[in-house]
């Protein structure tokens, strides 16, 4: 046929059997990729430290999605929360991966069958004997079936009525586990961080889809609407399908980047806004203040801070710290976290407590500035020593650690104090192993960043695809040069003036 590469899809334009075949093959490729990717990730995933080396630090992409839907066990005998198990059951990580690969193989065979046996009776219009699809009816069928799936997911899987539930955690990502979720039917269901909204919205949307599907199965579109929206043209289906996909991609890019109940930080890592707003830092200080109010010492109060919470309050876990073309997991960047050194408290020689100003998200370097409780600069690491007034040496800054591995240790040596002041710019201080993976020390993004970038990019691309194919189907006659009144115009002598319909000849 000699089609250029960008027009090859015309081979299935008027061939319903092979149109079905290529869609089944596409499903086979998607399911096959998902299953294969899951097996690859399981082969390289280290489940030994869910606190300091969780899945998102290791760059896992599909494991978090399986986990949020209720899969927590592996045939390798481990649990995602760090425990060991003896009976993981069929629906383990490997079981789900295997199911996708088996499904992919079946779809592959079905695609070949439909490619060979393309001329089926079901695709023929009995009135004309030509291949034809009743697109409004097919739309109704798909709407009904997707409504059933949506309702079933919300009413059974999420609620635990027939299924495991979903991943639910506290606002600080410390106590996450898979559990059933009750639908939230009040106004709280519209809060994107309330898990109950996932159940209620799927039930509501599924019900609407079922009713809408039945409507489109039982009511034919009016003729003017059918013609106006080009409902008989398969490119209309393509255009509206692309619209649905790009809209969904934009939505999930938003829920992933800004955070929601569907994207728990234990599975995908914290958001950049939690660093920008000092979200975890505030909670840590609140807990320490509560401990001090109970007559605990500073050392005791800081020692009770969970290592998991302290680790979230580290800039290396900020997904916006990754850079373009920085491939690899977070562990390949700043290294594998080994332990929390503790919280450094800086003081000048008068005993005044000083706080290191933290690095904003979009800075690679930032001046080391220490301020007091009123925000007044009291010490710094100067760029020019000759002009310095607040250097660590001049002000006599010391540092003492509370909690963590260096609990109770203090340093007064200026070089050591400056070292920890620089590290305190990045949040809580952790010991990082850069040797094991030959990590280069340059921050990487988390799967949260990759997912957002990928879906936002493809959503934009698909938006233009929707405009393109929508315009092609709506203005098909214009682009093709076909006019509804063309038959009258091409008749020789139909008009006194060529192409002017106002000068139509009268029959004698």
From Swiss-Prot:
<feature type="transmembrane region" description="Helical">
    <location>
        <begin position="140"/>
        <end position="156"/>
    </location>
</feature>
<dbReference type="GO" id="GO:0045156">
    <property type="term" value="F:electron transporter, transferring electrons within the cyclic electron transport pathway of photosynthesis activity"/>
</dbReference>
<dbReference type="InterPro" id="IPR017486">
    <property type="entry name" value="PSII_PsbB"/>
</dbReference>
<keyword id="KW-0157">Chromophore</keyword>
<feature type="transmembrane region" description="Helical">
    <location>
        <begin position="237"/>
        <end position="252"/>
    </location>
</feature>
<keyword id="KW-0150">Chloroplast</keyword>
<dbReference type="InterPro" id="IPR000932">
    <property type="entry name" value="PS_antenna-like"/>
</dbReference>
<keyword id="KW-0472">Membrane</keyword>
<dbReference type="GO" id="GO:0009772">
    <property type="term" value="P:photosynthetic electron transport in photosystem II"/>
</dbReference>
<keyword id="KW-0934">Plastid</keyword>
<keyword id="KW-0604">Photosystem II</keyword>
<dbReference type="GO" id="GO:0009535">
    <property type="term" value="C:chloroplast thylakoid membrane"/>
</dbReference>
<dbReference type="Pfam" id="PF00421">
    <property type="entry name" value="PSII"/>
</dbReference>
<keyword id="KW-0812">Transmembrane</keyword>
<feature type="transmembrane region" description="Helical">
    <location>
        <begin position="203"/>
        <end position="218"/>
    </location>
</feature>
<feature type="transmembrane region" description="Helical">
    <location>
        <begin position="457"/>
        <end position="472"/>
    </location>
</feature>
<keyword id="KW-0602">Photosynthesis</keyword>
<protein>
    <recommendedName>
        <fullName>Photosystem II CP47 reaction center protein</fullName>
    </recommendedName>
</protein>
<dbReference type="GO" id="GO:0016168">
    <property type="term" value="F:chlorophyll binding"/>
</dbReference>
<comment type="function">
    <text>One of the components of the core complex of photosystem II (PSII). It binds chlorophyll and helps catalyze the primary light-induced photochemical processes of PSII. PSII is a light-driven water:plastoquinone oxidoreductase, using light energy to abstract electrons from H(2)O, generating O(2) and a proton gradient subsequently used for ATP formation.</text>
</comment>
<keyword id="KW-0793">Thylakoid</keyword>
<comment type="similarity">
    <text>Belongs to the PsbB/PsbC family. PsbB subfamily.</text>
</comment>
<keyword id="KW-0148">Chlorophyll</keyword>
<dbReference type="InterPro" id="IPR036001">
    <property type="entry name" value="PS_II_antenna-like_sf"/>
</dbReference>
<feature type="transmembrane region" description="Helical">
    <location>
        <begin position="21"/>
        <end position="36"/>
    </location>
</feature>
<comment type="subunit">
    <text>PSII is composed of 1 copy each of membrane proteins PsbA, PsbB, PsbC, PsbD, PsbE, PsbF, PsbH, PsbI, PsbJ, PsbK, PsbL, PsbM, PsbT, PsbX, PsbY, PsbZ, Psb30/Ycf12, at least 3 peripheral proteins of the oxygen-evolving complex and a large number of cofactors. It forms dimeric complexes.</text>
</comment>
<keyword id="KW-1133">Transmembrane helix</keyword>
<dbReference type="GO" id="GO:0009523">
    <property type="term" value="C:photosystem II"/>
</dbReference>
<feature type="transmembrane region" description="Helical">
    <location>
        <begin position="101"/>
        <end position="115"/>
    </location>
</feature>
């Amino acid at each position: 046929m000699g089609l250029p590469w960008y027009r090859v899809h015309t081979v299935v334009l008027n061939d319903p059997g092979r149109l079905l075949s290529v869609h089944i093959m596409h499903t086979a490729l998607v399911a096959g990729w998902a299953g294969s990717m899951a097996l690859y990730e399981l082969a390289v995933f280290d489940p030994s430290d869910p606190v300091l080396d969780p899945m998102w630090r290791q760059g896992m992409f599909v494991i978090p999605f399986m986990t949020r839907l209720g899969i927590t066990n592996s045939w390798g005998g481990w649990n995602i929360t760090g425990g060991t198990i003896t009976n993981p059951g069929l629906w383990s990580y490997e079981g789900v991966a295997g199911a996708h690969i088996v499904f992919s193989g079946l779809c592959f065979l079905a695609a070949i069958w439909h490619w060979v046996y393309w001329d089926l009776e079901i695709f023929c219009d009995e009135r004309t004997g030509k291949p034809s699809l009743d697109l409004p009816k097919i739309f109704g069928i798909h709407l009904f079936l997707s409504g059933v799936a949506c309702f079933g997911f919300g009413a059974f899987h999420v609620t635990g009525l027939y299924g495991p539930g979903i991943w639910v955690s506290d606002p600080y990502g410390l106590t996450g586990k898979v559990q059933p979720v009750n639908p939230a039917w009040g106004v709280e269901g519209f809060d994107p961080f309330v898990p109950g909204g996932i159940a209620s919205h799927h039930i509501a949307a599924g019900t609407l889809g079922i009713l809408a599907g039945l409507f489109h199965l039982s009511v034919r579109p009016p003729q003017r609407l059918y013609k106006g929206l080009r409902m008989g043209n398969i490119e209309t289906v393509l255009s509206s399908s692309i619209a649905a996909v790009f809209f969904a991609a934009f939505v999930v890019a938003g829920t992933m980047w800004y955070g929601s109940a569907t994207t728990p930080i234990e599975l995908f890592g914290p958001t950049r806004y939690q660093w920008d707003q000092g979200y975890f830092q505030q909670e840590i200080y609140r807990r320490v203040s509560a401990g001090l109010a109970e007559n605990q010492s500073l050392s005791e109060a800081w020692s009770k801070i969970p290592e998991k919470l302290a680790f979230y309050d580290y800039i290396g876990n900020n997904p916006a710290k990754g850079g373009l073309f920085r491939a690899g997991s977070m562990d390949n960047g700043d290294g594998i976290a080994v332990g929390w050194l503790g919280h450094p408290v800086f003081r000048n020689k008068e005993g005044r407590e000083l706080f290191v100003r933290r690095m904003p998200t979009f800075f690679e370097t930032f001046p080391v500035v220490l301020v007091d409780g009123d925000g007044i600069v009291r010490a710094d690491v100067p760029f020019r020593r000759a002009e310095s007034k607040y250097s660590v040496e001049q002000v006599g800054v010391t540092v003492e650690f509370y909690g963590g591995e260096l609990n109770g240790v203090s340093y007064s040596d200026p070089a050591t104090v400056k070292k920890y002041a620089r590290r305190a710019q990045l949040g809580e201080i952790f010991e990082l192993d850069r040797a094991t993976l030959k990590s280069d020390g340059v921050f990487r993004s988390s799967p949260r960043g990759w997912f957002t970038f990928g879906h936002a990019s493809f959503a934009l691309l698909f938006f233009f695809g929707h405009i393109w194919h929508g315009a092609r189907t709506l203005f098909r006659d214009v682009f093709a040069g076909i006019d509804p009144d063309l038959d009258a115009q091409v008749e020789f002598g139909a008009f006194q003036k060529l192409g002017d319909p106002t000068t139509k000849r009268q029959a004698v």
